[in-house]
Amino acid sequence: MIRQAHASLDIISRRKKAEKIARLLQIDRFPGPIRLLEIGCGSGVIAHYFAVHPSFHCDVSAVDVLDQRVEKDNYHFEVVQGSQLPFDEASFDVVISNHVIEHVGDGAQQLTHLSEIRRVLKPLGSGYLAVPNRWMLTEPHYQLPFLSWLPTNLRSPYLRISGKGTHYDCRPLSACAFEEIFRAGGICTTNIGGTPFSDLLYK
């Protein structure tokens, strides 16, 4: 399946998201310097925010399968293929995966994504992972009501009938499914946001 680019390139909204992540992870309480990785950096605004913030002292790396960045300075960037990360084990104090896991592929590829986060994260490190809830009333990528509620084989036909695409290339998860895949990946998590019909936030 050919996967579409879904990155938000709006600087203002991405900066607000970066501020939210910093607040939820309490980055200002981390002893510096902090090695931080953003997976699926899209616009680059979040990576840039952490790289230049005077209070955080972050050494930032970022990866994505495409280079769509509008903010390119003050951090290291690499284009990657798939979910494998080009970093050594226990390399980072913080790993951010913001609305990425629903784009990496099927359940096995999603598990690889989580396993790679665990591999590169230091034993006492922290991660931030957000994913659209499958049960959101309006699917956020295509703005169609109940799109992700449908069985997998009906999502692409609905997309075509709506005129908004030809195939549905995302795999959002319910809270239960996501917690199951976390357990399979051997990752300890805390739910830090989300309701039955909103984004799921974990650290």
What are these model-derived regions, one by one?
Residues 96-108:
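A short SAM/SAH-binding and catalytic strip from SAM-dependent methyltransferases
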Residues 58, 75, 125, 187-188:
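A structural micro-motif
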Residues 1-84, 88, 94-98, 114:
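Conserved N-terminal segment of class I S-adenosyl-L-methionine
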Residues 105-117, 126-203:
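S-adenosyl-L-methionine-dependent methyltransferase catalytic module, highlighting the catalytic core
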Residues 84, 102, 136:
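Active-site micro-motifs of SAM-dependent methyltransferase domains
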